[in-house]
Amino acid sequence: MTDFEVVVVGAGPAGAELARCLAQAGVSVCLIDRLPHMAKAAFSSAALPLASIDRFGLPAELLAARWCGWQLLSPNGEWHHWQQSQALGAVLDFAALRQWLTAQVQILGGELMLGCTVTACELERSGMKLITHMRNHKAESSSIRSDWVVDASGQSRCLIAEAGTNARDPLLLGVGLEWLLEVDQNSWQRWSQRLSFLIGSNWVPNGYGWVFPMQPGCLKVGVCRLLNPNKQAGPSLGVLQKKVLGLLDLDGARVLDRHGGLIRSRVGRSDCHGRGRLLAIGDAVSTANLLGGEGIRHAMESARVLAPLLLANLAKPNNLIKSYKNKLKCQLGARWNLSGRLAQRTWQKLHTNQADQRMEKLLQGLKHCSAADLSELLFNYRFERYGLRALPYLFGMGGRSKSS
């Protein structure tokens, strides 16, 4: 049986970034993923601010297009625009990102096992090692041994499951689909250099639609919604997607790829971060930003938080799980927790005229902000720039908010 210091299950941004950091530090690490290659199931809108691209050292070849502005279609059909001359961020080629991260793991000496599904993880009799069992695409079984196992399997939480989670912490579930379209130059120009969103119950009840530029001649168009347990499901995502394409005069574009996915997150982020020698990162511990609908940054950030703690523990055992949970919460900040509550209030309630009117008020209030200010709001949760007392009311939280 092969031995490693750390086994990481899931080669998405969180798992691959953790494996990359550990391999770079000389740790014997094995990265496992059920996909046969990283170009498959590349579901992510993958818009990142420039600061995150620099922080994670992502090379230029991963950037499909840069953006320097925003445009939002409001519930009443009015487009709102925010633009500046300097780039604010980039849309990544998500498949290329995953391929690059996993290639880096191998270059740095880590082991990569693709096309393998982890079936179980158990403690060895000695109590000092974990045995990870898996099955490859030929249904052949094998096992490996390690000091630590990290569940980076995303919303499926295939190993950590729901043990230790606060049952009173609301679980938010979202579904989305995205199509990669081939368009003519004029159509591409119309949507280039900005991130575009459609917000309102007329377009996508309980969610929103989007158009992101990719390489010249390509656009990513998608819809997503937060599931509302108290409301009967509305039109399917496929129906909503076709409606959005027709509204934007993109229904005649050639579809190059279709993909979709599920996102789960707990409002209070009470997920179990680890037990024994099993840890969890990324979407498995609700790192996603559900208000802005993006998860790559925080997933990779969770890897950056855990990596040095694992290195220290391998050298000298300590109370890793408690330190990890506290440091991650500190790194992502209090505003990150507030964003989860705002996401729940915003998207789950966005299916009535009253909710549309609140959204109209919010967009009117943002009219005089700069493009950079809007980025600070959606990516860094700088709510106070727009009046912390007013925002909860506009999002439908009701009553007075206490100042922080």
Where are these regions (language model features)?
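Beta1/beta-strand and adjacent pyrophosphate-binding region of the FAD-binding site
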Residues: 1-12
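N-terminal Rossmann-fold NAD(P) dinucleotide-binding loop
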Residues: 15-16
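Predominantly flavin-linked oxidoreductase catalytic cores and closely associated redox partners
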Residues: 21, 104-250
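Glycine-rich FAD pyrophosphate-binding loop
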Residues: 21-42
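N-terminal FAD cofactor-binding segment of flavoenzymes
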Residues: 35-72
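Short beta-strand to alpha-helix junction loop
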Residues: 84-103, 227-235
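FAD/FMN-dependent oxidoreductases across multiple families
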Residues: 227-310, 314-321
